[in-house]
Amino acid sequence: MIAYLDTSAFVKLIVDEDGANDARSWFEEAGPAISSVITYPEACAALSRRAREPGRRGARVEAWIEALDARWSRVLAVQVTAQPAGMLALRHGLRGMDAVQLGSAIRTRERLREQGAQAQLLFASFDRRLLEAAEREGFATLGGPLE
């Protein structure tokens, strides 16, 4: 299995919350795990925000970032060009960074096909709108509409 993880799936690798066990399983089973270069800074922002949430006393963002770094070192990070992502935002009504995530996955799928890869690229997310857009773009998806 080759899995593309967006930021919502990647954060669940670090934080114990609904969907975390699924995300961790996908990450461990993926060979390789792939994500956009924007996932790292987005994940840092999300982890910082979660550490400030009520009920998260004792959450140490530094420990989460260390865990993020350990996992990020195992990710193939991909770039995307701006215009295709912009067209995806228009086509699917996506937020800008979600369009970049989907564009990165599409570019990855194209490269895998060019290289003759037989494995299917699965798109993992916990964002309902992004999952629906990925399905319309022909991806099999992993995740759930939790956000």
Please place each PLM-identified region on the residue numbering.
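Amphipathic alpha-helical segments within well-ordered protein domains
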Residues: 8, 44, 48, 86-89
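Acidic catalytic patch
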Residues: 70-92, 99-108
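Alpha-helix capping/helix-boundary segments
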Residues: 10, 39, 81, 101, ...
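Short glycine/serine- and small hydrophobic-enriched flexible loop segments
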Residues: 12, 45-51, 106-110
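Short active-site oxyanion
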Residues: 1, 30-33, 70-73, 118-122
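Short, well-structured N-terminal submotif of metal-dependent ribonuclease cores
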Residues: 1-39, 50-63, 139, 145-147
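Short beta-strand scaffold positions
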Residues: 34-35, 96-99, 125
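Acidic, PIN/NYN-like endoribonuclease modules and their adjacent C-terminal/linker elements
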Residues: 2, 40, 106-147
